[in-house]
Amino acid sequence: MNLHEYQAKSLFAEYGLPVSEGFACDTAQEAVEAAGHIGGNLWVVKCQVHAGGRGKAGGVKVTGDKEEIRAFAEHWLGKNLVTYQTDEKGQPVAKILVESCTDIANELYLGAVVDRATRRVVFMASTEGGVEIEKVAEETPELIHTAIIDPLTGPQGYQARDLGFKLGLNPTQMKQFTKIFMGLATMFVDHDFALLEINPLVITTEGNLHCLDGKIGIDGNALYRQPKIKGMHDPSQDDAREAHAAKFELNYVALDGNVGCMVNGAGLAMGTMDIVNLHGGKPANFLDVGGGATKERVAEAFKIILSDSNVKAVLVNIFGGIVRCDMIAEGIIGAVKEVGVKVPVVVRLEGTNAELGREVLAKSGLDIIAATSLTDAAEQVVKAAEGK
């Protein structure tokens, strides 16, 4: 689960981090009033969406005219913002963040992730702020400095100072950076973050550090113990198909291929996607129907997969461990009849009553291709997707 910038900054403020005074507004009038409340003669207005690249897409504006703030809000509220990180439809804009303008002397980067290799929270800092950190990592990795947090001792001041020296901070800035580092590290663990970024962390013209932007990703598996964070969820930013799948306890992730995949078990689902790729196909999705693959859930899974117009064939790969394959076969037949599937469907069944399940499919009279193995299934579905 991701948070909006204004939500991230509200958490930053709770931990004593320096952020701009700002207000998230639902209407153009609120945006104008927010500028008046903030005061000054220069403001920044930003579309609030779960995507980067807002500035290049016209979703960020610096202005000293309140009527321009009104016009900006009227233009974007209720519309979708398309950036390089969204699909062609973009993300809906429901709030506009109005902030005081900050005079910038230099831009830095500070972020943290859960690193699976070290099984630790790893902080990253760089002098290359304000740009895509992925690009920096690829082209000039030596400019990214790291600090690994030991879960037994927690964040240490010396780690902050080490990063601060590498960023070229002066003694005053070093103290500020240490406070920011320690606050972020504590916040990361307190709220079960999976990702955290301040890009840019700026040095103002007065020489102070300031959190100009904020990006936070939460570990969805921990939301049960984070009621406050869970309450910040904005469903409008979710993929519609993924949100619909979640209602039926289906794990669905949209991809950009043309082979729909329906599998029971996350590991088997990933293996299925790999073998489709191996045989020249491109998966259109990851979809795990779980252990209890009932007719109703299979039907919903088909509906979700086929809602993607790019899908040209569907591969159903089921291992009958918890459930019997003949029962799954009945569910697939019922789902195909109910949904009215118009694309080729390849089914591979293994496990309990697998042979019986294949017989049920063969006698159904439907255009369902029963595969004899996973390799056969992958080859057949790739050919079907290509129209062969």
UniProtKB/Swiss-Prot annotation:
Binding site for substrate: N264, G321, I322, V323
EC numbers, comma separated: 6.2.1.5
Cofactor note: Binds 1 Mg(2+) ion per subunit.
InterPro entries the record matches: ATP-grasp (IPR011761), ATP-grasp_succ-CoA_synth-type (IPR013650), ATP_grasp_subdomain_1 (IPR013815), Succ-CoA_synthase_bsu_CS (IPR017866), SUCC_ACL_C (IPR005811), Succ_CoA_ligase-like_bsu (IPR005809), Succinyl-CoA_synth-like (IPR016102)
Residue sites binding Mg(2+) per the record: N199, D213
Residues binding ATP: K46, G53, R54, G55, E99, T102, E107
Residues covered by the ATP-grasp domain: 9-244
Pathway named in the protein's UniProt entry: Carbohydrate metabolism; tricarboxylic acid cycle; succinate from succinyl-CoA (ligase route): step 1/1
Keywords of this entry: ATP-binding, Ligase, Magnesium, Metal-binding, Nucleotide-binding, Tricarboxylic acid cycle
Cofactor(s), by name: Mg(2+)
Cited SUPFAM superfamilies: Glutathione synthetase ATP-binding domain-like (SSF56059), Succinyl-CoA synthetase domains (SSF52210)
GO MF term (any one): succinate-CoA ligase (ADP-forming) activity
GO biological process terms on file: succinyl-CoA metabolic process; tricarboxylic acid cycle
Gene Ontology CC terms, in alphabetical order: cytosol; succinate-CoA ligase complex
Domain of life, per lineage: Bacteria
Reaction(s) catalysed (UniProt annotation): succinate + ATP + CoA = succinyl-CoA + ADP + phosphate; GTP + succinate + CoA = succinyl-CoA + GDP + phosphate
Reported function: Succinyl-CoA synthetase functions in the citric acid cycle (TCA), coupling the hydrolysis of succinyl-CoA to the synthesis of either ATP or GTP and thus represents the only step of substrate-level phosphorylation in the TCA. The beta subunit provides nucleotide specificity of the enzyme and binds the substrate succinate, while the binding sites for coenzyme A and phosphate are found in the alpha subunit.
Family assignment from sequence similarity: Belongs to the succinate/malate CoA ligase beta subunit family.
Subunit field text: Heterotetramer of two alpha and two beta subunits.
Classification via PANTHER family: SUCCINATE--COA LIGASE [GDP-FORMING] SUBUNIT BETA, MITOCHONDRIAL, SUCCINYL-COA SYNTHETASE BETA CHAIN
Record's protein name: Succinate--CoA ligase [ADP-forming] subunit beta
